[in-house]
A protein has these predicted regions:
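Short, solvent-exposed loop/beta-turn-alpha elements that line the ligand-binding surface or hinge
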Residues: 73-84, 155, 232-240, 309-317
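Sec-dependent N-terminal signal peptides of Gram-positive bacterial secreted proteins and lipoproteins
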Residues: 2-24
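Conserved C-terminal helix/tail region of periplasmic/extracytoplasmic solute-binding proteins
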Residues: 322-350
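Short, glycine-/small- and polar/acidic-enriched structural segments
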Residues: 43-180, 187-189, 205, 211, ...
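Pocket-lining segment of extracytoplasmic ligand-binding domains
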Residues: 113-115, 123, 188, 194-287
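Periplasmic-binding protein-like
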Residues: 132-143, 225-253, 303-306, 343-350
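Secondary-structure end/capping motifs
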Residues: 254-331
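Bacterial lipoprotein signal-peptidase II cleavage site
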Residues: 18-39
Length: 350
């Protein structure tokens, strides 16, 4: 029954997304008749002329929401009446994505929110944020029951992943706000695989991991428990949403292909809806596993309900990110590139 429901939902979403492309392209055709020079606005007998979009996504929660889009809107699978044709790549390191954006081999990418701000500062406005796609996904995991609060981490060793990105700054901020100097905690930065190895081999180990790495660890070792949700700890402080993942684009690409970017965002929002639907977990998990966004489909199925997918654009996106960036800036200006991003950083927020 669940499999049937997932297939029906996938079919419904496909029809919805195809209809969205048709609607977008009708507008584009009118703009073309008025003299628009955008490649995505040119109509032909076979359908609209497509604009190729080089899209990169981080493995893990930041990339999960795009799985449907990546699968069904590639250069090979994009419908004839849709102006978007994705060439997608999934990578594990923020640096791979930022390097690709800087050198122009990626046009649009899903990255950590603090990385987006740093990159905008580094490129002097060469990057804009298009949407927030992921909220809080960080957890403190433990073998044992000694950690009941952030304060309990004082004097402990914590294996963690995410140095130089949101996880490091969020952890340090939450420790400080709970009366613990981060220097009182032995935070050992590692890859997710190394953290998992330490947790499996240790008797009373503690770690910080994001979903789905946290999910995979708990599936591998039944003795590991979820001690704290850092989203819950953040919410206790009343500092707005813990906005951890976003979609960014190269400013040059955005200015040259505005209709394509808007069509991409329409499709991305629909993809988020599909990937976060609780009745379609099996189908969504299959896509995530197939594309290598998680290690396998089984982990994806367990992790999806905790991936905290969202889709926030325009003025709401700006308000959400500015509140989050203000917290990071006060804690460590270098975490977002030394200054608050300019208004032009926020696409469609005017």
């Amino acid at each position: 029954m669940k499999k049937t429901l997932s297939l029906l939902l996938a079919a419904a979403m496909t029809l919805s997304l195809l209809a969205g492309c048709g609607s977008k392209n009708n507008n584009d055709a009118s703009q073309s008749a008025a003299g628009s020079g955008s490649a995505s606005a040119s109509q032909s007998q076979q359908g609209v002329e497509k604009t190729g979009v080089n899209f990169m996504a981080l493995s893990g929660p930041t990339g999960v929401g795009a799985a449907y889009l990546m699968k069904y809107y590639s250069a090979e699978t994009s419908p004839a009446d849709c102006p978007v044709a994705l060439n997608s790549t999934v990578v594990a390191d923020n640096k791979e994505v930022t390097d690709a954006l800087v050198n122009g081999t990626a046009d649009i990418a899903a990255v950590a929110t603090n990385v987006a701000a740093n990159l905008a500062a580094k490129t002097d406005g060469g990057i804009q944020v298009l949407a927030v796609n992921t909220l809080g996904v960080l957890y403190i995991l433990e073998k044992g029951d000694s950690v009941q609060s952030m304060a309990d981490l004082a004097g402990k060793t914590v294996y963690a992943t995410g140095q130089g990105a949101n996880p490091e700054y969020v952890l340090n901020y939450l420790l400080t706000q709970n009366g613990v100097d981060p220097s009182q905690v032995d935070i050992q930065w590692m890859t997710a695989q190394e953290v998992t190895a330490q947790m499996v081999s240790g008797d009373s180990a503690i770690c910080m991991l994001p979903v789905p790495a946290a999910t995979a660890l708990m599936m591998k070792d039944q003795g590991v428990r979820q001690a704290l949700s850092l989203s819950d700890e953040w919410d206790k402080l009343g500092q707005g949403s813990l906005a951890m993942g976003c979609v960014v684009g190269r400013t040059q690409f955005i200015e040259e292909h505005p209709e394509t970017v808007d069509a991409f965002l329409d499709l991305y929002g629909d993809s988020i809806t599909f990937m976060s639907d609780e009745h379609g977990v099996a189908g969504a998990a299959a896509l995530v596993g197939e594309l290598g966004i998680t290690a396998n489909e089984q982990i994806a199925a367990k992790a999806l309900p905790q991936c905290n997918l969202t889709f926030i654009t325009g003025a709401d996106m700006k308000a959400t990110l500015e509140e989050y960036y203000q917290v990071l800036f006060q804690a460590d200006p270098a975490s977002i590139g030394g200054s608050m991003p300019y208004d032009a950083f926020y696409y469609g927020a005017e």
